[in-house]
């Protein structure tokens, strides 16, 4: 049975197009027997924003404040959750050409030297290996493969850095470019999702 971690990151609640697609994917994969865990980073599972104190604490050490210890434990939980699943599905709506702050914050919690990646004599090496990632990205305009898409290239870079190089992408484009474009973008994205196996 495939174990799947779904990360939602939209802050739009019931108006979120990425959430519609993610829910479609979850329903599709549940019929295939996947065990799904959902973390709603833009909603009920929002994380504390990583600041200087937290960032310092995530490096570990003997003299951590109570807050740093709590945030380090949270990071350990997020990393364990990441490593415990076979497939990571990331809902990545485009906000001002890039990912939501809530998703970037999750990345800051899990990207830890010696934990999810390490540095070697030949360069960095990811420690989260043997995983698959699926990116579901929604955007109001048409940005795929263009210079204004700072969502997919960035996420592929981060995932590759921690060892996840098997990455598939579902695009829902031009969602704010009129009703027909919206319906076409969502329909094509759902069709792409229907082709994915858990």
Swiss-Prot record:
Obligatory cofactor(s): FMN
Domain of life per record: Bacteria
Cofactor binding note: Binds 1 FMN per subunit.
Amino acids binding FMN: 10, 16-18, 94-97, 138-141
Subunit structure: Homodimer.
Family affiliation: Belongs to the azoreductase type 1 family.
Record-given protein name: FMN-dependent NADH:quinone oxidoreductase
Species this protein is from: Shewanella baltica (strain OS223)
């Amino acid at each position: 049975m495939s174990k799947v971690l779904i990360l939602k990151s939209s802050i739009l609640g019931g108006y979120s197009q990425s959430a519609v697609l993610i829910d479609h994917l979850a329903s599709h994969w549940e019929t295939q027997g996947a065990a799904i865990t959902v973390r709603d980073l833009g909603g009920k599972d929002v994380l504390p924003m990583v600041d200087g104190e937290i960032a310092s604490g995530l490096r570990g050490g003997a003299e951590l404040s109570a807050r740093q210890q709590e945030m380090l434990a949270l990071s350990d939980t997020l990393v364990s959750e990441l490593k415990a699943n076979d497939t990571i599905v990331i809902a990545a709506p485009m906000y001002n050409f890039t990912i939501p702050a809530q998703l970037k914050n999750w990345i800051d919690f899990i990207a830890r030297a010696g934990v999810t990646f390490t540095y070697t004599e030949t360069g960095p090496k990811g420690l989260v290996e043997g995983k698959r990632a699926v990116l579901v990205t929604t955007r109001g305009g048409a940005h795929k493969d263009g210079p204004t898409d700072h969502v997919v290239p960035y996420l592929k870079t981060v995932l590759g850095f921690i060892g996840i190089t098997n990455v598939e992408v579902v695009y829902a484009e031009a969602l704010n470019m009129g009703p027909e474009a919206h319906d076409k973008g969502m329909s094509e994205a759902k069709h792409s999702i229907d082709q994915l196996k858990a």
